[in-house]
Amino acid sequence: MQLLKSCHYHVCMKVFIQENSWLAKLAAAKLKADQAAIVFGSTIHLHNTSRAAFLANKEWLCHELKHVEQYQQHGFAVFLVKYLLEWVKKGYYNNRFEIEARQNESNISLLKRVSIM
């Protein structure tokens, strides 16, 4: 993941947003949800929500930014494997990475560590 030199005195991650993503559409179908966001690396893929609506929903945004941070901490391939194994063992809701993301939904400090492209 590419890092910027600084972002409001913090190390800053570049985060991309992809609207109308087929990946997010698949996630929505699997979760039986009308809307979905799914993260791959530093890109947040959206289904049935606009970039503006997603960015306005700070809890949802912080949840997905935590996943971006998890990718950064573990590395792309390692995180993806760990996440999928956790999902197979415990399902979506009890997946430790989802629990951590839910616990960070009000962590607005995540917003200071990213630059949304």
Model-derived regions: residue spans:
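Metalloprotease/metallohydrolase-associated module, dominated by Zn2+-dependent proteases
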Residues: 3-48, 74-117
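Short pre-active-site segment immediately N-terminal to the catalytic Zn-binding motif
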Residues: 44-61
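Active-site recognition of the HExxH zinc-binding catalytic motif
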Residues: 59-71, 101
